[in-house]
């Protein structure tokens, strides 16, 4: 118990009289805070930024399993991290103090541990890792069913502890290969892609996360099937996919020569080989990326050639795949923790003619950042020990627990022996704007490369200093690294640092990355990673927790989730306004905002405005000074052509990028329809189009005749404080009529909250009058009828409902009905609220029609492709994988 208490900072007080032990947590104040208390303090901390406040409370504030809050603001979190890292620092020479560390973390100003470290450091409530990402893979061949299942189990075990996972499928036999079992031939890659994807979806429940990267070599005979696998609807929905492309393939694409695929891919004597048209397969990659943003491309020869860990490939550090976002190529059972340096904070006198980058302070802080990352490795080893202890104490048999235990033991060994870190950056876009430069201009690229070069040299210098003070990573050998291109650039940049590295070694096998900083950048209130600003002004909405108090609910969707909306100015754009004397309290109209943006350094530099080829060149220039990789996305307009995507991908290879991802606006919403059409003959396509038209625009004679009884779905929503209800009558499972009104009106309809379906019955009386009744089956199995829907709702609402029901019956497509509703102009706020509710109710029936990529969290078409991942600008949701 004393060992346990020491490791996890608990005090164990034994009562000799009662023979009991009282456990006291000494590393944190056990006082709990209400969410309202935390929100009030945190909102002040973030200067009124609602989104940053909610992101921090929901994702990073210290909580126990019951949801009790133990931190009231990020200041408490930063104290927690500083205290724990200072404890590790005290073990080594020249330690940093808790106060020094806190100053680096406070206000997210300089150094920001990301994700796992932020939630896990000093957190004794969770038995989880600090690592953000992992790669798994068995030793030797992994094409047996046993190996495939083992990787599946390892993937799930990591995801249940909040880790993102990547693994490579290149060792699985291609489809049709002979196997020694009852199947006789291999099923190939795709069924196992589905298996791994389904496992990810399964584990991503109840607050757990599941993020997966699947990769394959272009040399594999099933590469084309892999590339097409995600085009089938509802298949492989929980994985990112990337193709590992070698230089030989690219040269064949350029020259038009055939390319040889084989299995096994690295064997001098393959059991199967085939020559393919490289250009044709390349065009398929381009088309799919243009149509659906996948697959991503990994330039594998560049990755391996530049990889410092691969100098030790024969010692277990051979890179096989990447994490889900693609910024950390890893060997099996290695892991990485992430940290970002906030570049904007080093610009003195930002947005003025006197703007200056403080390189002296930057160098000092980068050395601290690398040191902190090494300390976090020690904390991670403690966390893994706790995981291993937890597994050992679990009641299951040793046979059941063996895979998980051995998995974490292998991860621990790699962690101890390689000590890999992921020091990165954020706020590149704001930094160059603050310096008066336009993002991705030649001057901005030169400046950004110089900053990254300084960061690389200082991070490696810090690792060398730590090797002298703490010892080098276990297998360091300067001779192995002397011809590595990245190390050679370091030697040229700082010969003395290189000589010191040869003499003392290096503490960490690899140090640098540029990772996604989705929620991190929300809290730093800056641009993300090396991305440009998304927009200077936009609308966000956040999901309201049912337990939230004193919030404004602007809408409730069909699923019953509540949302709060607010207009957001990009924080550093506001800083520019203040510096240049513009009134930040004024309510600007669209024209005024456009003029304002035009005067700023952000003009022409948003994610949709930048020169795309220059952005790729920027990535290539920065990549020269990053030993791992960079997660970044090139955002393209919907009108972008496949030829442009082709140019971007080729340019990325030529300028030294290790990977490239594009996102064309609207591509996610219509890819399935496009692909299905491309695979049919013109006659079949015409037939399909005719059938689709019949399905959307119903035959008039059939639709006009209303049955007496229609199935009905009930949708509830809320705008401001008003509760609304919609009854959607269905004919052939398609909307035929819709009635809406206030649910909490004095004469409104009160229904059980669990009720979602029923029937609408039309009664026609002898005098010609009509009445609509609603009927449902209660929980006791009895029919319950509510008579006179038309009398329950406001007459004006009822008349508009009759109008909409009419156009639905005549077969107007749902998307056009929504446009019709949206185009109606009303003076009354109540009627406009009704309009918004009807629009949301009808959107449920738009499956397969709506264009654009929607946020899986809030449902809005406001997803920004950024850092190789996706971030919703409405609710703050971000996802890689």
Regions found by a protein language model. Give the residues of each.
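Cysteine-rich micro-motifs
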Residues: 868-878
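Short, Gly/Pro- and small/polar-rich lid/capping loops
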Residues: 498-500, 676-730
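Internal maturation/activation junctions in enzymes
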Residues: 101-102, 262-266, 365-412, 416, ...
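Catalytic alpha/beta core of large soluble enzyme barrels
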Residues: 50, 55, 326-328, 380-381, ...
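Function-dense linear segments that define catalytic or interfacial modules
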Residues: 84-89, 104-181, 189-192, 203-206, ...
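Conserved, charged catalytic cores of large soluble enzymes
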Residues: 10-99, 181-195, 205-317, 348-352, ...
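Short, cysteine/histidine-rich loop/knuckle motifs that typically chelate Zn2+
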Residues: 856-860, 874
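Cys/His-rich microdomains that often coordinate metals
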Residues: 861-863, 879
